[in-house]
Amino acid sequence: MLITIPDLLTPEEVAYMRQILEGTAWVDGRSTAGDQAGKVKRNLQVPVDSPEARELGNIVLRALGRSPVYSSAALPAHILPPMFNRYDEGMTFGAHVDGSIRVVPGTGQRIRTDVSTTVFLTPPEDYDGGELVMHDTYGQHSVKLPAGHAVVYPATSLHSVTPVTRGSRWASFFWAQSMVRDDWRRHMLYDLDMSIMRIRSMLPDDDPAVTGITAHYHNMIRHWAET
């Protein structure tokens, strides 16, 4: 399940974040990659323990908190602190799967990575290449979104970032442990929740059709969720 969230960040938030990132230090992105991913990863990242990463990460987390689409798609139990990367000319990230377990910086707490998210911080017209590509049994799916838009996808996905051939592509990325670890179940729950929203736009909340399907949704959550 691949879901895009338009305008997760406001234009003002994007502008502020880019201003801060312009003046921050960047390090080799391979410092946070595993052995296999490190062999195909060529990008730069903001150190996860830097003041800039913490400040900007909190902006992203607040944006997630006001996004019902993210909540419905990810059903997050825990969200790892958002990170920030950049791909300059010639930089790329070959096909890989994200590590299944990550440690929350400074705590030692281990989080299962069920859901991945990328938030684009650079307008697509400012760079060539840099598409996020999902590889699955149905082929390849490229994602290149406006600044402030986000894409949410299963962390189990084989994916890559194509080489940047002009400009620089900046983004925030992070993972969540979902209350529902199985992607197919999350997909069904998301589709059902979107149907509920559409029905509620046409019928009053006390209509039996609305209360019935809403009860069904919450009972499925109750059956599948881990907290």
UniProtKB/Swiss-Prot annotation:
Q: Which InterPro entries match?
A: Oxoglu/Fe-dep_dioxygenase_dom, PKHD_C, PKHD_hydroxylase, Pro_4_hyd_alph, Pro_4_hyd_alph_FE2OG_OXY
- Report residues binding 2-oxoglutarate: 169
Binding residues for Fe cation: 96, 98, 159
Superkingdom per UniProt: Bacteria
- So which cofactors does this thing need? Fe(2+); L-ascorbate
- Name residues in a coiled coil: none
Looking up Gene3D superfamilies in the UniProt record yields: q2cbj1_9rhob like domain (2.60.120.620), Rabenosyn, Rab binding domain (4.10.860.20)
What's the name of the protein?
A: PKHD-type hydroxylase Pden_4677
Name one process (GO BP) from the record: DNA damage response
Q: Which SUPFAM superfamilies match?
A: Clavaminate synthase-like
Q: What is its EC number?
A: 1.14.11.-
Cited SMART domains: P4Hc
What GO MF terms are annotated?
2-oxoglutarate-dependent dioxygenase activity; iron ion binding; L-ascorbic acid binding
- Top enzyme class, one word, equals oxidoreductase
Tell me what organism the protein belongs to: Paracoccus denitrificans (strain Pd 1222)
* Domain called Fe2OG dioxygenase: residue spans: 78-178
Question: Bound how, and how many: what does the cofactor note say?
Answer: Binds 1 Fe(2+) ion per subunit.
